Amino acid sequence: MSEKILINKLPTRTWNRLGVNETPIVWGQTEDLGAEQITAAGQTERLEISDCADAEYSGKTVNIHAHEGQTVTVFETLKAEKNLLVRTALHIEKNAKVRLVQIQNAAQDSLLRLETSGECAENGQVELIQILLGRGDVYSDGHFELNGDGAGFNADIGYLGQNSRTIDINLAVNHHGQKTTSEINAAGALKDDAKKIFRGTIDFRRGSAGSVGNEQETVLMLGDGVVNKTVPLILCAEENVVGNHGATIGELDEDTLFYFESRGISAEEAENIMARAAIERLARTIGDEAAQTAILAELEEVL
């Protein structure tokens, strides 16, 4: 039995008519695929997570624990065929770091839900990379708590939306400790009739003096039917903090198209080249040859 649920909720509501406070989806009884526990320091762990062929809705839990002074790197390749929920929880102790790379590699008519959370102690660090390749609908909900002084969070998100697919992202970083930092960067392209919402929230809680948070999104719109909603939000209950947000939203201009055409590249090819750019950039900066090869190969298939 399935029912309508609300996900990706903004921490502070805005006008209902904007349609960004939360997202309704249909979800049903979830087949539990078990839990993974990852603590290996100084190593790269690779998880390939798929849904259950015999269930309409599947769910997987991943717990990642970085002990004091350790670094843990995890690659999650997410292969939904139907409806898949992946919950990933990060626990970062003092002077530790978790690097999490999530790669969407889902089927055409699938629905992928990502629920990612993290808690950082003093000088703990999180690096989150999400690569959303444009097949199936994807809903990503992230919540991170910078509890200790000097804790830091960095996110790089690359996406490609095409056909009538939906990309719905909610990311909230709460600054609790002093001199904490957050950097959120999202970039991608929308084609055909794709829809995308990006909600980025930086919340400076009382006691977070000396903290800095920045968020930036760059969106390339490549179709008359695309729908883009960008919702940057900075909340502040503390003095002596710095928060910045910005967004760049645009289309391919005539000069750029002329540049490509003068080199024998059609307008359609030019759009595809530009649409690939954000994901190709991330693929080449993750520092893992196997993952880079897989991402670029998948990108060739979807575009």
Question: Where on the chain are the PLM-derived regions?
Answer:
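Extended amphipathic alpha-helical segments enriched in small hydrophobics
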Residues: Y259-R281
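Long, low-complexity, mixed-charge
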Residues: M1-A53
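Generic structural signal of hydrophobic/aromatic residues within well-ordered alpha-helices
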Residues: T14, I279-L282, I295, L299
